[in-house]
Structures are given as C-alpha cells and as structure tokens.
Amino acid sequence: MTRPLRLHPDRLFPADAGTRDIARRLYGSVKDLPIISPHGHTDPEWFAGDAPFPDATNLFLAPDHYLYRMLYSQGVPLDRLGVPSKAGPSPADPREAWRMLASNMHLFRGTPSSMWLNHVFGEVFGFEIELSAETADLYFDRIGEALQSPAFRPRALFERFNIELLATTESPTDDLRHHKAMRASGWKGRVVTAYRPDPVIDAEHEDFRASLSRFGELTGQDVESWSGYLQAHRMRRAAFMEMGATSTDHGHPTAATADLSLADAEALFRKLLSADFSPADAELFRAQMLTEMARMSLDDGLVMQIHPGSFRNHNAGLFARYGRDKGADIPTRTDYVRALKPLLDRFGNERGLSVIVFTLDESSYARELAPLAGHYPVLKLGPAWWFHDSPEGMRRFREQTTETAGFYNTVGFNDDTRAFLSIPARHDVARRIDAGFLARLVAEHRLSEDDAHETAVDLAYNLPKRAYKLDEPARTPAAA
C-alpha cells in the first residue's frame, strides 16, 4: 500500500503553540534567503560540463555515504548499491540498486537522511507518495525522465536552488581544470574551490609519496627540501585563490598543533621522506603543518578550517576494496585546549587570521570550544558537523555554545555534502532549527523578537559570508 508523502509546514518547530508561532515568523524572514554553501564536497565537473545526471542511483545513492553506510550496517553489500570500488565502476544495475534503497527506506526513520530525501522528492521532483518497494520503479522512471530535461541540469538546479555561492574542496595536486572551465564558459554561477592539503601533509596517507611527486610537478619546486615544499604550498594556494578560494580545510586525526624551530622542522621533514618514521612523527608533522598553514594564511588571507577527530577508514577490509569515504569513519574524543595551544601561543591574538574549528566530539562544546572561541580573536566555531548535522545535533550545538561564545563567534551553517540535491533541504533544516531556538529565547523573554529576526538572518546568510570573507577583495600574497 502506498503512503502519501507529507512535508508538514511546521516540521521541526517547537511543540508549544505560542513558541511555534514565533518560530514561524522567524523562519518566514529567512526561508527564501539565498544559500551560502562555503564548505562542501560536490564535484566541480558537474557544473563545468553541465551534463545531465544519469539516473536516480547515481544522483542520490552512489555519492552519499550517509545512505549506503546505513544499508551496509544491515548487511547490504556496497557492490549492490552502485558504489564504485578501487577496481572500477560498480557492476550493479542502477535500477536494482534503487530498488534496494526503496525497499529499505524504513531504516532511515528518524534520521536526517529521511528528512533530506523527502524534501528533495517532494519539493524538487513533485512526488506525492513515499518511496517504497512498491513505488521504486515509478520513482526511478520519473526521476530519470526529469533528469533529461534542461531544467534538471546541474547549472539550472544551482540557479533554481537560489545558491549564491558554493565551495568545492580539492587537493593541492588537482589541476583545477573544472574550475577553469567554469570560468571560461561565462556561466554566472559562483562556484569556488578550497585548499585541502591533507594528501601532501599526512605521511600516513596511502598516496602520500605519489601526491608529493605530483605536487612537485605542478609547482616546479623541489618538494623534498623544506623550503621548496613550503614554497609549493604557497604557489598552489595562490592558484586556488585565482579560482575563487577563500579558505583552506584540514581533516587531521586530531587538533594537535606544534611550533618547531626551523632546524627541527627540517629534520622532521627529512625523516618523513626517508619512510623511517613513527606514527608519532607523522602526528607531529601534521601538527607543525597546521601552524605553517596559519602562517601562510596571515600572508594570503585564506580562512583556515580544522575538521579533526575522525578515525578514518575504521573498516580495514572495506578500505582495501573500496578506498576512502565509504561510510566507515568513526568519531573520536578530541582535545582542543592543549592541542591548539602552540598555534594560539604564536598566532592567537592576530586580527588578520581566522581559524574555524569543528568537532565530532560534542563533549567539547561547552568545556573547550565555546570558551576558546569566546576568548581568542582568531577562533570561530564551525556548525554541528557530519554525525551531528541533525536536528538534535544542531540544537545541542546552540544550547552548549551560545551562553559562552554567543552567536557571533559562530559561522552560520555548512552543508558539507557530496549530495548536491540535498543542499536546499539541509539549509532549510538549519534555518528551522535556529528559528525554533531563537523562538524559545523570545518566549522566555531573554531576547526581543526584533533581535531574534536580525540574528536569524545573520545565522542564515550574513555570518557565513563574513566568516569566509566572501565579500572581500582577493588579497595578493606576500612574496616568499
């Protein structure tokens, strides 16, 4: 039996009628604002080539580890879901993979994935019945037909979604050809890149040596000398800035930073290149490089983002077959007070540096992160991230950080997604949750409704633009 697909207009608003009325009014002031997406992982090739998405499976399921990690947890092999492996494309029939998702939609009840999907199904594709085993083929065929129309090309959807800016994330070894192609095409959509140097910083990364070699080829620098290696970073950062980058991104296992002497940094770098190094050496080098990146950001103005605290590729067997980013990353406890101190001792009072810190360890919100961001001028708090970008996670973030850091030491919302069509849904959830949180403060006479309206607009639009320097002219890096 098919069930109607309902998107309740009051979803995620407070249950109390009076507070809900306030939330409705606050949400009304932000629901139609343009989307600022300053950090994410969509594929720039989509917008460069503007080719049609092939089918529902390749659009929704194959790129979204939120979906297939849940299915995998219930015993569904990834090779039945359209997920590519190291050996090449998935052998799965896209329709059969879609049927597998449809027959398991009950697994997502109560999760943000269910909310995001239903938003896309209803608002973007106009479905009025839920996805299920019975409706799988109907969905697959209607979505497939829609994707062949010009209105569902990547650029048309970008414009339909009212996206003002979208940032992708690339490695220093990426030649940025897709960003160059976008600019050469004359398209007016603003898609920028962000500098993610992990593959040439993390000596424990499986592609470290190959990435380092490519790094040298792209820059013409001797990247096996410390000075040449740092100069290669400066050169690639400048190239990324030419493609609109305003930020860097660092996905280290911990938030550790270091401030070594020049001699010690050079010696550590030589040790890593010899391949005779310990995990502690690799960790110290990552820590030193966060400080080096901060130093470069003082010169070129790029905002730093630190996304620490994930045990990457926890499932060794899955990693061996499928590689990274396949739903097997697990949050860990993360220290910030001690870990960030070397960087903060060096640069914490600089007005020209901005560092946005994220966490997967919610226990650190009130104890460490809010007090740090509530003191150091360089620090801002990134929003609830990854495992916590759910309604409950967003509420916990506001409840545990606002009393110490306020709203204006945060940076608004990041969707941080590979799933392009979910971007409006994710921003809508964030706007509804913030409207509800602010409505409660108004109902408790802790905030005027005028101030709440202003704050809601800032959280949805102004703060991300300000935090990521999206209205500032590009800065010319100082000569090395």
UniProtKB/Swiss-Prot annotation:
EC number in record: 5.3.1.12
PANTHER family listed in its UniProt record: URONATE ISOMERASE
Isomerase as UniProt keyword: yes
Pathway membership: Carbohydrate metabolism; pentose and glucuronate interconversion
GO terms, molecular function: glucuronate isomerase activity
Enzyme class: isomerase
Protein name as catalogued: Uronate isomerase
Pfam families to which the protein is assigned, alphabetical: UxaC
Alphabetical GO biological process terms: D-galacturonate catabolic process; D-glucuronate catabolic process
Catalysed reactions, semicolon-separated: D-glucuronate = D-fructuronate; aldehydo-D-galacturonate = keto-D-tagaturonate
Similarity comment: Belongs to the metallo-dependent hydrolases superfamily. Uronate isomerase family.
Keyword Cell inner membrane applies: no
InterPro entries the UniProt entry points to: Metal_Hydrolase, Uronate_isomerase
Keyword annotations: Isomerase
